[in-house]
Amino acid sequence: MKLNFSGLRALVTGAGKGIGRDTVKALHASGAKVVAVTRTNSDLVSLAKECPGIEPVCVDLGDWDATEKALGGIGPVDLLVNNAALVIMQPFLEVTKEAFDRSFSVNLRSVFQVSQMVARDMINRGVPGSIVNVSSMVAHVTFPNLITYSSTKGAMTMLTKAMAMELGPHKIRVNSVNPTVVLTDMGKKVSADPEFARKLKERHPLRKFAEVEDVVNSILFLLSDRSASTSGGGILVDAGYLAS
């Protein structure tokens, strides 16, 4: 997808690997100035070599105070991609307080915090903007051992709608992308059992999982003016799974 983001500044969380990393690369190639946020410094070092000129920020978004310190003075942002997330696989009866708190602090609370910072600045500057929350199809369907992750993504669905309603009058659009399994490092955890992965893939009408590029293209579309009247919804990148 050929889009031009020249003159715009984007912030991408979870930028070190997978979907976030490729989103940074695509935005950089499309002319945007990009702030890349992740907690692993080595990922930022290698990403900066691939994308000269990006602004790397190393912070654990699960730490509220550290995030405030790292991003509180980040400056104007026109495009935000909330991609940071983690998966802790446990059945319901074995979910620990630590796993629950960690999952919600990274997968959901950080979306609140970073979005508040960015949206307040957009409003103060009187400029439109676009926010994309990277969710999952498990916001809508259940999978074994993903109850905590699914709960964070289900909550993100309502957060996206509420943000769109409240920020819409300020010309700030908010949407989500909801992919099926994407074979990133995180996605491979879900599909580690070959037999489970085979059966799961067969339940997708297109008989495939999503490629990282598929998700990135949907993110870019929602960030761009080509989706100027789209807000409060989500794009399913699920190879038809929910339709089945």
From Swiss-Prot:
Catalytic activity: a secondary alcohol + NADP(+) = a ketone + NADPH + H(+)
Chief localization: mitochondrion
GO terms under cellular component: mitochondrial matrix; mitochondrion
A Gene Ontology BP annotation from the UniProt entry: small molecule metabolic process
Residues noted as binding NADP(+) in the record, renumbered to the chain: 11-39
Enzyme Commission number(s) of this protein: 1.1.1.184
Active site, per annotation: Y149 (proton acceptor)
Keyword NAD: yes
UniProt keyword DNA-binding, yes or no: no
GO molecular function, one term: identical protein binding
Enzyme category, top tier: oxidoreductase
Keyword annotations from UniProtKB, A to Z: Mitochondrion, NAD, NADP, Oxidoreductase, Phosphoprotein
Function summary: May function in the pulmonary metabolism of endogenous carbonyl compounds, such as aliphatic aldehydes and ketones derived from lipid peroxidation, 3-ketosteroids and fatty aldehydes, as well as in xenobiotic metabolism.
Subunit structure: Homotetramer.
Protein family (similarity comment): Belongs to the short-chain dehydrogenases/reductases (SDR) family.
Note: Uses both NADP and NAD as substrates. Has a strong preference for NADP.
Name of protein: Carbonyl reductase [NADPH] 2
